[in-house]
Amino acid sequence: RGVTDEFIEPVVLRGRPRLEPEDAAIFFNFRPDRARQLTKLLLDDGYDVTTMTRYSDELDTPVAFAEQDVDETLAEVLSEHGLRQLHAAETEKYAHVTYFFNGGREEEWPGETRLLVPSPREVGTYDKQPEMSAEEVAARFDAELAVGGYAFAVVNFANPDMVGHSGVIPAVVKAVEVTDACLGRVVETVERLGGVALITADHGNAEQMLEEDGESPHTAHTTNRVPLVVTDPAVSVEDGELGDLAPTVLAYLGLRKPLQMTGRNLCK
């Protein structure tokens, strides 16, 4: 029918199309951001639920694989030094710059400010609105930077990934164009305030829109190498990995990295 994975609608199987009182559920999601709501719903209805990982301390479920505590994250180290920090994104990527960025911590660290911009809800898929909320994210982020006195700020633009999942190439092109313009605006603000911007990603998507056959849409993340652009003309940037970003930020701030960080400063 020409329906790819991204757009398969829910299916009800014949025979037993619903959960019965004696049924139990096993949740295979390892990420909690989309699983905890459904888990809570099942628990509230009295079902036995086992989850792959711990989704929330508020959910009393057996867990297949216990999580490891992540200590001395970048946000925690900045907080320990009394530095202010800003974390900003629209809804689709808000958890990525807060909960995930902070090693699975829900609460803000002292000195941490969070900025949430609602993602569009007027469309079913973002190829219909590839600009998403990027312009508002950039505007509010810039305004907060200008008055906040932050030592560190992180902002996520969701467009290349979220629109990339649609596989609709013209929409992805528009998404990247909008992101480029908004990113340029943010960099101008950072440089005007005397700061340095580090521009990177944690995975690819929009750069590969077709499968190897040259026809089928590619809608998944890629494992391609990602760029790291540093807007400091006085340094050269070495190849590295995502784990090197936090030590690089700390080096710019003149802070020693904790022993828990095994990465290195990429700017020489």
Briefly describe each language-model feature range.
Residues 1-268:
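Feature captures the catalytic ectodomains and active-site-proximal regions of enzymes
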